[in-house]
Every structure is written in C-alpha cells, then in structure tokens.
C-alpha cells in the first residue's frame, strides 16, 4: 500500500515517465503482477496505441488500460458481480419519467412541469449527480426535516426527494444504476486478490466525484501501489491557475491521512514536450503577474476571420499546408473547439478539402430518417392523425422507399391533402382520394391526361400502403395492455413494415459503395431501437400501462439514443472540445472560436438546484456536490491552458468577428493575454492576408476554382485583382485534370438574372394564336411583365391550401349579393330587417358549403367567420337599401358575364381587338351589377363593382390613364356596346363607374357621451358611400341622389353641390361625357399596346413603382425572379404621377364610334 504522486506543469514529462516505467516493468517481466492504467474514456484508445505501437514490446498480459467502469467489471469477473439488472441511461430516464407522471399530484413545486419531457431529463441528471456525490434520499429528507429554509427551496427538495425515494424503491433488489455499481465495486475490493497484486496508475484526470474519490481510496488501501499523475505545480491557492488539480491533490492528501500513509511526491520541472521556445514561453508565462516579453519565432499564430465559415475554411487550407509543406500526417494535427456551432461547420467544410477527421463527440439519433419515422408514427397516433406528423412520416421515405420517385409522389399527395384539409380519420376515406378528385387540384379543374392519371394512381396507392401500415400499428398497439405487450406489438409492426430487411439491404449497399460510416449508423439505429424495447420490457415487464403513456415513455427512450462512431482510419485529424478532448503531443493544434463568451465561457447553473442552494446544502448537511458556477468560472483559464499546451510544434488560435446568428463577437481576453507575452505576435486578419498573398488561397483544386470564380467576378466588375488569379485561370483552363466544372463556373459569371425576350413562335406556343383573357391579366402585365410571364406563360401556381384567402372572401360576397339581388329583382328599397336576415341566411346556406370543399364548416373558427360574413352581408344590405331609397337608378343585372361568343342570351358580347401583330384579343369577365335609369328615350347606366378590400375600392384615374386600372372603363365599354341585349333604348350614355366597399365598418368615438343612435346610423351609411367617377350630365346627377340641392353633399355617391348649385370640386368626382368616352377609347388602346407587348415576348423583371409602392410586396413569384429591393432599383419602371389625368386625356385626339374629337 504505497502512494505516489507525479506533479508538474503541462509538458514536463509526467505521463512519459509513467509510460516508460510501465514499459520497463513489462519488458522485465511480461507475465508479472498486473499493471492497471486508469484514464478517462476518451484517452484509453490513445494510451493503448502507445503500448501497441512500441516496437520493443512484443505484447504483454499484465498491462490493461481501463476507465473506472471497466475496472469494476474486471473485479466483478474475479469476485462475482451483482445479481441486479444494470439500468442503461435510457432505461433510467424512462423509469423516472413514469414515476414523475404517477407522483405528479403529490409534487409541490414541479406539478405543472411534470408533463414536459425535459423535466424528467433534468431530474434524472440531478439524481445521478446526487449518486456521484454519495447523497442519498435519507440525506435529503433529514436535511429538509431539520433545517429552516425558504419555502421554494424546501418544496423543491421535497419533490426531488419524493421522486428519488420512489426511484430507489423501484430498483431495490431488482435493478442497479451505473453509479450504484461503482459503490458495489468499492465493497468488492477487499475480496480481490488480483487487485492486491496490482500496480495502479491514474492519469488524465483533473477532477473527481465523491464516488470516484471513494474508489481511489479503496485502490490505495488494497492495491500494491497507486501512482496518480496531476497537472499542477502543487500550489493550493484557490485563485491559482491549477486550482482544480490542486483540489484533487488536497483530497488525495486527506485520503492518505485517513489511511495513515505518506505520499511520495515527485515534482517535474523540466519542459520536454515543446520543440521551440515559443511554446515553452507560452506555458511558463501564461499565469505570471510580471510579464517577460520575448520575440515570437512564428510557432504561435492568431487568426482573425470575418465569419465562422471563413475561419474554418482558413484552418482547412492551413492543414493542407501542414501536410504538403511541413510533411506532417493528419494524425499529427488536432482541432479543439468549444462553441457547438463549429461541429456543423467541420462536417460541411473539411470534406470539401478531402481532409479525413474524427469528431470525438456523440451525435443524437433523433434526426435520422428511421428515428424521425418512428417518432412521427407515434405522434400520428397521439394526435389522432393530424396532418403535420402524417406529412413528416411520409417525407422520411422510410415507409415509401419501394416507390420510384417517392419524394415526388409524396409532394403531390401533400398538395392534395393541404388543399382538401385532410386530417383525422378523413385519411381513411377512400372516396376523398378518388383519382378523379385530383383533376380539381388548384383553382381550375381539368381533364386528366393518361400520364397524370397513372401518376395520381401511384399517389393513391402509396397513400393506401402507408395508411395500411399505420392502421396495422394502431390496431396492434390498441390490443396491448402491458408494457411487454406494447413492446412486442411495436416490434411486430416493424416486422410488418419489413423495416429490418429494408435497413439491412440499405446497409449492405452502403458498405459495398464504401460508405462505411453511414452503414454503421444503420446498424446502430436498429440496435438502439431494439435496446430501448428491451429496456422497456426489463424495467416495466407485465406492468399495465395506457398506450398514451407507453408512447410517451418510449419517446423518452428514443431521445437518449446516440451514435458512437469508431474512427474509420488511424491517419486523421482529431477534433474535440477543449473541455473533454484528450489530445497530447500533437505537432500542430488549432484552437478555434477563441472569442469572449466562449473562452472564457460564462457558466450558469443548469441543474434543478441553484448554486446558492448547493452552497447552503453543503454547509448544513456536510456533503459535497458538483462544482458551482463560480468555481467553474475560476477554472476557465485552466481549460485554456490545458488546450493550448497539447501541441509540441505549433499552436494556432483563431476567432471570428460574427457569430452563427449574425451577432458581433469579441476576441477572447486570453488571446490578449497571450499576445502580451510576445513581441511581434500580430493578429493576422484573414481577408487582408489573402489580399496581400493571393497564392495562400490556392491550396486545394476544387476550392481554388470557387475562389477563382469570386476573383474573376470582381475583375469583371472593374475591381483590382491580383495577376496570379488570371494566371491560375489559364493553368486550370489548360489542364484536363483541373478544368472539370470550370465551364459551369464561368457561365455563372455572366449570369445577371435577366430574362430573355421570347421569339414569335415561342410566344404563340405559350399564349396561343389569340389572346383570351380577363382584365386582371392585362393589369398584372402592367404591374410587371415577368409576373404575367410566370403566371400565364410558365403557368406557375402557388400551392392551394385549405384556408380562406382574400379572393375567396370576395367571391363569397359576390355570390351572396347576386343570390339576394336576383331574389328581390334588385329592389333593395323593399327590404326590412326581418327580410334581410331571412335572405342572408338562405344565401349563406346555399353558397358557403360550396366554398373550398365546405371549408367554412370545418372548424369552430370558420363557423365563427361564417357568422361574421353573415353580419357583414346584413350591414351591406342595409346600406344598399338606403342607397336605393334615394336613387332613381335601378339595379337590373347581376354578375353579368361577357365574352367574344356568348354562351347564353344573358351574356354580353365583347368586341374583339387586334394586336399590332394581328393577334385577336378576346376579353372576358363579369360585371357585378348594372344599374339603369331612362329619361326622354335615353338610358343611363351605372357600373357597380363590389370590393371586399378598401385598397381596391378606389378609382385612380392616373392608373386608368397608364393602363394600371382597366376594369371599370372596360365594363362601361361592354355595357354601351350591348344596349340591345340589355334591353336599353337606342341612346345609351354612361352614368357612373362606381365601387361599393363590402365590409364591416368601424366607428370611432372620443367618449361614451358621443354615442347617438341616429348619428351612429348616419356614420355607418357614410362608410358605404360609393366611390369612382360620375358623368357630370345634370340628368345623371339628379338621378344618382334625388336629395341633391345647393350646399348638399351626397352620402351615397361622390357628388356634392355648392351654394349656387354648381358641382363641388371637393365633394365631387365627375367628368363630362366626352372625357369618359376618351378614357374608354384610351383604355382600348392600352389593351392593344399591352397585348402587343405580350406577343412581342416581353418578360422583363420590371415592376412598376407607383406612389412609392411596388407590386413585389404581394407578388407570389419573388422566389422565381429574385428581384431585390436593395440592389435592383434600376429595374423599376415609373410613370409621371404629377399629371392631371382628366386634363391629359382631354388633350388626346381620339376618333371613335362615340363621336369624340
């Protein structure tokens, strides 16, 4: 029973001395007493290599490299193990989650958090922490009973103690945790003869838990000798750089005093690891107060990058230089990081440079398609077949892998499902998924082609296959009663899915193609899944459980699964975190992410028990718990020290100025401290360095081509570019080995997001030999030619969703008002409140079920919206009644369609126009309402257009002039052309072109006293006042509002009179008859010009900016045109907005059938 301590700073030869000592013993007596080297799990492989790769050793049976848990198993092999079943991490958390749910009603502080998955994970960590530091439920209960404390803290500890106690009772005599097995190991030590003959070496640790100190105490007591290696100068100052390992030394001294033995200390002061003065000076001076600056010889570098991605690209380039120019091997290089965001960057960047690497971290399995399939399957059952988990399940492609183009079929199915609002048991309705229904996908139904029919039949078949599997799974699970039944049902369902065979086939294909890591992932996925099922049966067995609880517990288990990947080769870059990675004696170590906030890292308490509660508990209960945040914060300098002293040749520190989320970052204060130790240690700004040394960017062929592309693009933009890039281009271009993909990059250089003008033949192929279009299509072209090209040329359509769009609401109002108008023959004056309500209900019952597959009856929200629609209609009818009472114009025609060849007698004829290319223009559409008034054998007509949006319920004559608003003039033109079909007199003249805003008015009051019922009704009526343009003819004016008189402004039409009876400029929107005719004729010319441009093949991305607004704000095609408001302002078209449109139109000479100038 002897105890040795090798003490010294980093690189002083402590571990080398230990290895030399062990090797000498192995050479002297290969079959001698056992030698045990205890090291952290991350270091065991590296230390085993140190023995295996030694040519002087021919192998030995006496030396083993173990961590504490493996050592316990070695002892159990000799003296016998425990009889209880060992609980895995997943099994432990599943059991604790179930206990929490059962005990939820007894919890005082955590009752509301009990249902959350994360809470059981935190609670498991806390219980494991208690076990590591030998804190039992009895400790907690005794402490709570004897001490006065804050109510919150008391309730918290009582809750934890309750779960802890229940957990201990559940596992008693049946299960054992990893921490408990170590306690059992301590109890078995006296029985081990093998241990009594062993020489024990402990290396690579900087701190221990209470249970580990007890193990060390047992080893010291029962082993022949124990040697512990610590990185410390022996200073016990709590503010020393070596506080953490010195704390370990203090504990070892206490153990030695308890066992009444002395520690044979051996101090190591001579530095051996470092090959140069830079690293020696860095190690010796890092923690001194009085700095001794020396000249830097170039073995320490500090790199500053703009972004994290740029930072890792530069590290990759420098690794290539290390391999090519310095003759290093990949295994001589290590990268250490702390910010988890870097792990993703390593995976995405290093393969681009063909750098082999191994990240020493475990990755969660939760994002693997198989795990996502299983978790989505569980959620489908839990959520009663909601659409989101169903679509996630389908998109994993695990259950649909047997289908060709399965991803495309699933996309089509998703479109259909979202359009029809499929959820719940509607998935099972075969009639809903009839192939014929797919012809109605989108806004327009069409007849299916044979290819479309075959495709949609595959979609339906795929859906049926997946539904069959889900139903099988649901049936199997619903028949289960115990956990064992559920686990069996789950496994049998996976067999029914043929998942094992599918995974094994995929694994074999990956292995055959050399993708061994992905193949290993599949093995671990399946084995992990089986392990969770085994754990469930082990822990719960025949215990009854609801399906809901089982699926919750099962999901908890799946969350714990992690990939443990074995390195695929020995010669690879080692990557790990600064806190855990065990890399020693590397020629070059890169420390990335050296930013303030990462190194040092602000440490906050993450456990259920706060730092203050820990300190109070330790003081009052005389126990030790895991270190508090302030203690961990003090050790940050030691973490940096250990990380930077792993190298023996070069150390490169790097940091970025921008984080992964775009936040600004500062340099680590440790780098400022390191920089102060040396003269001439400057920070290298990477962009500036490459600007001065462009050849430094040319380290890897593929990446050089990408950087070359950026350089040539800058050159084309007249920026100054180094001649070396032009030389590089010529070399790559002329090399058959290097020029692969160069043509693609060069074509990208000239890409400027410009559309191409279509040829005459292609225009006719896209648009036809005649244009049959609505007014809105031409208005869309005026907004942006590309928008028209995308919608009517390429026929791009947005996915239709099962939700009410703005245009759906407009269609509803139009249909309802048409229905009611026809029922009363347009005589709104006859309506009373009872009749309004009756007609509204009738109309809604008739029309709403036809909207979006009965969307408005699909949920409580939409049923509420239906009632709101009814209220708006009732208010609208009241306003129409009021307007009809005071107008001589009578509504006569409703929702009147027009086209070149009418299909019925009720439809109107639209005159065909012709483009400059001779292409016919056939305009079609529908006029919401036509009001007429006849006097002296002359008919006057009003065009009334219902708008549900306030923004579109305004007639802007400037827009009319420039062809941006063509609807009203077109409608008036059509009506004037069809006097006979409308039953009008031989003489027909325009009355008004008016918009009616269908809405629910909001009236503002300053106070309750302002509310007056009569005034309220008047204000409501004013909100429905028609807007637009009125013929200034006195007959029209008198007929629009019979109340008009001097000093009166109408509240139903945009007309008002001055004191002298003349039209008020402020209250009137009027134009003379000739002007209206000119607008109509000019509108026709806009049609011809627009249609001619369309057939000319114009497809420019050229939105029209009007009143500082762009149509891009509401355009569906921005993801196609990629127009950017910040850099594409040169693309915008504008018009002269300062013109007076009436004066401008009057100055145009137009000859037409109306007898204009």
From Swiss-Prot:
ATP binds at residues 8-15. Its cofactor is Mg(2+); [4Fe-4S] cluster. Pfam families: ADDB_N, PDDEXK_1, UvrD_C. Its EC number is 3.1.-.-. Residues 1-275 form the UvrD-like helicase ATP-binding domain. Signal peptide: none annotated. Residues 269-583 form the UvrD-like helicase C-terminal domain. The keyword DNA repair applies. Binds 1 [4Fe-4S] cluster. [4Fe-4S] cluster binds at residues 784, 1112, 1115, 1121. It is an enzyme of class 3 (hydrolase). Keywords: 4Fe-4S, ATP-binding, DNA damage, DNA repair, DNA-binding, Exonuclease, Helicase, Hydrolase, Iron, Iron-sulfur, Metal-binding, Nuclease, Nucleotide-binding. One of its GO terms (biological process) is double-strand break repair via homologous recombination. The keyword Metal-binding applies. GO terms for molecular function: 4 iron, 4 sulfur cluster binding; 5'-3' exonuclease activity; ATP binding; double-stranded DNA binding; helicase activity; metal ion binding. PANTHER family: RECBCD ENZYME SUBUNIT RECC. Heterodimer of AddA and AddB. Belongs to the helicase family. AddB/RexB type 1 subfamily. The heterodimer acts as both an ATP-dependent DNA helicase and an ATP-dependent, dual-direction single-stranded exonuclease. Recognizes the chi site generating a DNA molecule suitable for the initiation of homologous recombination. The AddB subunit has 5' -> 3' nuclease activity but not helicase activity. Despite having conserved helicase domains, this subunit does not have helicase activity. This is ATP-dependent helicase/deoxyribonuclease subunit B. It comes from Staphylococcus aureus (strain JH9).
């Amino acid at each position: 029973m002897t105890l040795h301590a090798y003490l010294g700073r980093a690189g002083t030869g402590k571990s080398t001395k230990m290895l030399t000592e062990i090797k000498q013993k192995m050479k002297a007596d290969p079959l001698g007493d056992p030698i045990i080297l205890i090291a952290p799990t991350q270091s065991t492989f590296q230390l085993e290599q140190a023995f295996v790769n030694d040519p002087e050793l021919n192998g030995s049976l006496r030396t083993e490299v173990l961590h504490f848990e493996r050592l316990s198993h070695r002892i159990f092999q000799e003296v016998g193990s425990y009889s209880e079943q060992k609980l895995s991490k997943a099994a432990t958390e599943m059991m604790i989650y179930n206990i929490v749910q059962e005990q939820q009603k007894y919890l005082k502080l955590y009752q509301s958090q009990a249902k959350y998955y994360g809470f059981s994970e935190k609670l498991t960590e806390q219980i494991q922490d208690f076990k590591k530091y030998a804190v039992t439920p009895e400790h907690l209960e005794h402490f709570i009973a004897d001490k006065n404390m804050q109510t919150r803290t008391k309730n918290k500890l009582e809750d934890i103690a309750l779960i802890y106690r229940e957990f201990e009772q559940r596992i008693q005599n049946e299960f054992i945790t990893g921490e408990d097995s170590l306690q059992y190991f301590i109890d078995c030590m006296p029985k081990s003869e093998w241990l009594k003959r062993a020489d024990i070496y402990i290396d690579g640790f900087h701190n221990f838990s209470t249970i580990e100190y007890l193990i060390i105490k047992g080893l010291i007591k029962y082993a022949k000798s124990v040697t512990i290696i610590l990185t410390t100068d022996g200073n016990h100052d709590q503010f020393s750089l070596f506080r953490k390992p010195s704390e370990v030394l203090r504990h070892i001294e206490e153990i030695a005093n308890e066992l009444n033995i002395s520690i044979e200390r051996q101090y190591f002061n001579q530095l051996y690891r470092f090959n140069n003065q830079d690293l020696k000076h860095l190690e010796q001076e890092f923690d001194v107060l009085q700095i001794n600056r020396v000249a830097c010889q170039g073995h320490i570098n500090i790199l500053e990058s703009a972004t994290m991605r740029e930072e890792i690209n530069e590290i990759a380039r420098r690794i290539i230089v290390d391999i090519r120019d310095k003759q290093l091997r990949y295994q001589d290089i290590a990268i250490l990081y702390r910010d988890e965001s870097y792990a993703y960057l390593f995976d995405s960047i290093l393969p681009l440079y063909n750098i082999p690497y191994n990240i020493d971290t475990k990755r969660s399995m939760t994002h693997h398609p198989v795990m996502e399939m299983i978790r989505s399957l569980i959620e489908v059952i839990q959520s009663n077949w909601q659409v989101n988990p169903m679509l996630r399940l389908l998109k994993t492609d695990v259950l649909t892998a047997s289908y060709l183009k399965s991803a495309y079929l699933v996309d089509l199915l998703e479109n259909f499902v979202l359009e029809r609002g499929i959820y719940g048991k509607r998935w099972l309705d075969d009639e809903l998924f009839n192939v014929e229904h797919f012809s109605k996908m989108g806004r327009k139904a069409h007849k299916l082609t044979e290819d479309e029919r075959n495709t949609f039949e595959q979609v339906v078949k795929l859906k049926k296959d997946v539904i069959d599997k889900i139903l099988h799974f649901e049936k199997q699970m619903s028949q289960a009663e115990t956990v064992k039944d559920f686990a069996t049902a789950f496994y049998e369902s996976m067999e029914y899915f043929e998942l094992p065979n599918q995974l094994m086939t995929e694994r074999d294909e990956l292995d055959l193609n050399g993708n061994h890591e992905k193949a290993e992932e599949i093995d671990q996925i399946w084995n992990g899944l089986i392990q969770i099922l085994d754990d469930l049966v082990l822990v719960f067995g025949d215990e009854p459980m609801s399906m809901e609880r089982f699926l919750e517990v099962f999901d908890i288990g799946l969350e714990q699964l992690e990939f443990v990947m074995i390195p695929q080769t020995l010669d690879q870059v080692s990557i790990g975190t600064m806190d855990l990675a065990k890399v020693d004696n590397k020629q070059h170590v890169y420390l990335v992410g050296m930013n303030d906030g990462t190194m040092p890292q602000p440490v906050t308490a993450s456990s259920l028990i706060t730092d203050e509660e820990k300190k109070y508990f330790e003081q009052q209960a005389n126990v030790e718990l895991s270190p508090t945040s302030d203690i961990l914060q003090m050790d940050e300098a030691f973490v940096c020290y250990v990380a930077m002293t792993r190298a023996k040749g070069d150390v490169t520190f790097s940091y970025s100025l921008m984080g992964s989320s775009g936040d600004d970052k500062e340099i680590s204060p440790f780098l400022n401290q390191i920089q102060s130790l040396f003269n001439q240690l400057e920070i290298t700004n990477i962009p500036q360095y490459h600007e001065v040394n462009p050849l430094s960017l040319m380290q890897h062929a593929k990446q050089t081509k990408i950087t070359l592309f950026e350089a040539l693009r800058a050159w084309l933009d007249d920026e100054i570019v180094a001649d070396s890039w032009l030389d590089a281009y010529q070399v790559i271009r002329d090399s058959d080995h290097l020029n692969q993909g160069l043509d693609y990059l060069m074509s990208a250089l000239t890409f400027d997001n410009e559309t191409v003008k279509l040829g005459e033949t292609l225009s006719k192929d896209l648009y036809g030999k005649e244009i049959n279009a609505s007014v809105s299509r031409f208005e869309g072209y005026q907004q942006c030619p590309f928008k028209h090209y995308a919608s009517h040329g390429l026929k791009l359509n947005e996915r239709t969703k099962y939700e009410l769009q703005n245009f759906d609401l407009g269609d509803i109002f139009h249909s309802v008002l048409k229905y009611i108008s026809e029922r009363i023959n347009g005589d709104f004056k006859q309506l009373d409140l009872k009749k309004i309500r009756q007609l509204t209900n009738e109309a809604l019952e008739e029309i709403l079920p036809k909207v979006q597959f009965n969307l408005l009856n699909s949920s409580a929200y939409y049923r509420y919206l239906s009632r709101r629609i009814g209220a708006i209609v009732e208010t609208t009818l009241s306003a129409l009644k009021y307007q009809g009472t005071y107008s001589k114009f009578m509504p006569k025609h409703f929702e009147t369609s027009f086209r070149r060849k009418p299909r019925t007698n009720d439809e109107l004829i639209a005159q065909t126009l012709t483009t400059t290319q001779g292409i016919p223009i056939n305009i079609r559409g529908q006029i919401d309402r036509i009001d007429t008034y006849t006097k002296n054998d002359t008919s006057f007509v009003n065009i009334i257009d219902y708008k549900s949006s306030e923004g579109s319920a305004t007639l802007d004559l400037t827009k009319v002039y420039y062809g941006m608003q063509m609807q009203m003039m077109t409608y008036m033109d059509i009506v004037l052309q069809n006097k006979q079909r409308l039953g009008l007199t031989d003489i027909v003249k325009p009355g008004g072109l008016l918009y009616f805003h269908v809405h629910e008015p909001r009236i503002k009051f300053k106070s309750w006293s302002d509310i007056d019922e009569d005034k309220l009704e008047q204000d409501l009526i004013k909100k429905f006042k028609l807007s637009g343009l009125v013929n200034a003819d006195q007959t029209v004016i008198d007929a629009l509002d019979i109340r008009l008189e001097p000093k009166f402004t109408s509240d139903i039409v945009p007309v008002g009179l001055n004191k002298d009876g003349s039209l008020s400029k402020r209250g009137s929107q009027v134009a003379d008859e000739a002007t209206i005719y000119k607008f109509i004729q000019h509108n026709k010319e806009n049609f011809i010009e627009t249609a001619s441009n369309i057939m000319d093949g114009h497809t420019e991305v050229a939105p029209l900016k009007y009143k500082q607004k762009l149509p891009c704000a509401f355009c569906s095609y921005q993801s196609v045109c990629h127009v950017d408001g910040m850099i594409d302002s040169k693309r915008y078209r504008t018009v002269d907005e300062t013109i007076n449109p009436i004066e401008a139109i009057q100055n145009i000479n137009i000859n037409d059938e109306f007898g204009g100038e």
